[in-house]
């Protein structure tokens, strides 16, 4: 039987699929007619049939893409090891001492110079194992001696497990911020305190009138005011007056106290919802009594006039005008020496004319 006939038989006969093995290889069994010797070429043909099975449309579950490592493990029959993580990097040296060449706190990386090989090793802030407890950020100081492990990185040697000499915490950079000594206090709004409740008296001795009086007393109780700050107290500021001091001031302005009394009662009956308005009285000059009137009056030219009416006190003397000029006051003279002058004018003249009285 030639190779061509064997391939035709392989495609025509139903192929039995075998589940994949642990190595991911699929085996196909092809029936061979009895009485015919199996040749080496037939084995190859069987292999060819296995290869042509998927192409002919046989439903085979082909494994995923193979890697070079998987091909080697398929031949050996052992599972492939998982991919190596970043933490399992090969360690080149452990507990190596070095001096920090420079470290940037803002960017979080720098370089350490090894003391044994004088080689610069990259260090990141995440590689610092024991940081200064007083520092807020992880860092190492410039020129500081540190102890670290050297591992293989993507671009070269890299430091890991960075501590101080002997495993102590590192000092840190002087540019790294320090931690706050105390926790920041955040004030929280407190709920308003409920009004003080009046203690309930025993039910046996209560009276209906006493409860109403207690309710009025609780409503009239003044609220406590917080004192002003120290710098505000030193100023002489006139604050609002209590209601008991405003009552006499309002009565002095001409308002009767009878009208103000019911208003204050209404305000007290309310729950002090609206504070009393501030009232500042207008300044008024105090009353000064005027001096008594002079018995004589003066004319426009400063001369005296005798009284036209009787002086027995039955009729009051005329008052002097209010719009009198100021300079006339200086010409005013006492009435004592003027009486003989008036008598001389009223004396009879030696001439034969009858006596006359000078009147203006």
Curated annotation (Swiss-Prot):
Q: What is this protein called?
A: Y-box-binding protein 2
Enumerate the InterPro entries for this protein.
Cold_shock_domain, CSD, CSD_CS, CSP_DNA-bd, NA-bd_OB-fold
Question: Could you tell me in which tissues this protein is expressed?
Answer: Expressed in meiotic and postmeiotic male germ cells and oocytes; poorly expressed in two cell stage embryos (at protein level). Not detected in preimplantation embryos.
Q: What is the effect of changing residue 111 to A?
A: Abolishes cytoplasmic retention and mRNA-binding affinity
Where can this protein be found?
Cytoplasm; Nucleus
Q: Which residues carry this modification: Phosphoserine?
A: 252
Which residue ranges have biased composition labelled Pro residues?
Answer: 188-197
A GO cellular component entry from the record: ribonucleoprotein complex
Which gene name belongs to this protein?
Ybx2
An example Gene Ontology molecular-function term: chromatin binding
GO annotations under biological process?
mRNA stabilization; negative regulation of translation; oogenesis; positive regulation of cold-induced thermogenesis; spermatid development
- Coiled-coil regions listed: none
Q: Which residue stretches belong to region Required for mRNA-binding? A: 219-360
Q: Where is the composition biased (Low complexity)?
A: 198-209
User: Which key words tag this protein in UniProt?
Assistant: Cytoplasm, DNA-binding, Nucleus, Phosphoprotein, RNA-binding
Where mainly located?
A: cytoplasm
Taxonomy, top ranks, is: Eukaryota, Metazoa, Chordata, Craniata, Vertebrata
- The record's region (Disordered) falls at 34-87, 159-360
Q: In what way is this protein post-translationally modified?
A: Phosphorylated during oocyte maturation and dephosphorylated following egg activation. Phosphorylated in vitro by a kinase activity associated with testicular mRNPs. Dephosphorylation leads to a decrease in its affinity to bind RNA in vitro.
